[in-house]
Amino acid sequence: MMTKNEIQKWVKEFPLLKTIMAAEEVFWRNPKYHAFAQAIRTIPLRERDVKEAEERLRRFAPYIAKAFPETRTAHGIIESPLVRISNMKQRLEKMFQTNIEGELLLKCDSHLPISGSIKARGGIYEVLKHAEDLALANGMITIGDDYAVMDSEKFRQFFSRYSLVVGSTGNLGLSIGIIGAKLGFRVTVHMSADAKQWKKDLLRSKGVTVIEHLTDYNKVVEEARRQSAEDPTSYFIDDENSIHLFLGYAVAAFRLKKQLEDMNITVDENHPLFVYLPCGVGGGPGGVTFGLKLVYGDHVHCFFAEPTHSPCMLLGLMTGEHDRVSVQDFGLDNKTEADGLAVGRPSRLVGNMLENVISGVYTVDDSTLYRLLAAMVETEEIYLEPSALAGVAGPVRLFRDLAGQTYVEANGLKEKMKNATHIGWATGGSMVPKDVMEAYYREGVRIETMTGNGFSEGR
């Protein structure tokens, strides 16, 4: 817990904190942002680590294709579409009276097979890695084998001797629960107070043990970690500090490169790429950012998006204290409809590794998320959960907020913006039950009718 004096000292040093503490929307440009060639020197991971993760996912593709028929057409590769959303771009420009230069795309991790969110990348990857490690160590397989053999009673019996434990606000729990149970593991998911009921119900229907907590995400992770430590057959998936989750997310960047090439979209010195990533604890956006920087270096600019009531990564980066600060220290309640982003304390791993790599962070109010959700349905017929819309707000904020424009000018991008590509990373949505999604849409329409006047003024 930070003292009152420390908070006051920071408010003096960072005047933007006053606005953050009032739970108002802000756009923050990272003053520690460096050229990637310089920034990577302090990062303990390299491209070979990501390539190794990609290779492992390839080994598991025959198993995935067999166990999850919906992945067969993609031959067991878990990937999502990248789509142009020009109608939504026009709607954004109209809603917020802002001209967005360049093209706007949506990366639909909301529609990833198996668990319908970005967590299908990191979560599924880490479980598969653990399964491979166990199977190799026990002589069940060798690296050259066809991993489709894992979809058998023999392997399910073997994996049932082991358990997986994770703490989650929802989507990570879904991905680990679904893949873990399918392999045969005993899975326990500890869920925080803000987790949606339908996510708990879905997990239970797959045979996963769900333990509900009244506390917030960080306390839940602590409890899950403690429970796992008591059982020698248990493996704890650490959302706050896992390198394996991080690498699973990073693989996305190399696949995105191919998708952009297939769409004839150039990314180079004169064609900058801007990527806007919803951020909870930071593992998902952190891994994707690291991967994108490996692929595009300084030609890609990654911004994290957080709810106004849960800006944990923003506070960690701004103060340089990372996981030593929480949103509660600054008088914020960590309550948001963006359940996947309701995190009070950021990942130390991501904050430390990427403090010179993340271009900036902006915050979005729940009402803005709902308005964008309704607009996305009306313009593109794409259904997303509220947290996924945080990334879609990015281009408006970049062009409308003073700090966004300062970033563009400071990086010599002003004349290049007409050639820019903007990608909002849609993190979840396809598994939301129809009635819940309908209620989200109605809420968006209601707020739009009431307000209809854009974001709060940029600061």
From Swiss-Prot:
It comes from the Bacteria. SUPFAM superfamilies: Tryptophan synthase beta subunit-like PLP-dependent enzymes (SSF53686). InterPro entries: D_Ser_am_lyase, Ser/Thr_Dehydratase, Ser/Thr_deHydtase_PyrdxlP-BS, TrpB-like_PALP, TrpB-like_PALP_sf. One of its GO terms (biological process) is D-serine catabolic process. Keywords: Lyase, Pyridoxal phosphate. It is an enzyme of class 4 (lyase). Its cofactor is pyridoxal 5'-phosphate. GO terms for molecular function: D-serine ammonia-lyase activity; hydro-lyase activity; pyridoxal phosphate binding. The modification N6-(pyridoxal phosphate)lysine is found at K119. Its EC number is 4.3.1.18. PANTHER family: D-SERINE DEHYDRATASE, THREONINE DEHYDRATASE, MITOCHONDRIAL-RELATED. Belongs to the serine/threonine dehydratase family. DsdA subfamily. This is Probable D-serine dehydratase. The lineage of its organism: Bacteria, Bacillati, Bacillota, Bacilli, Bacillales.
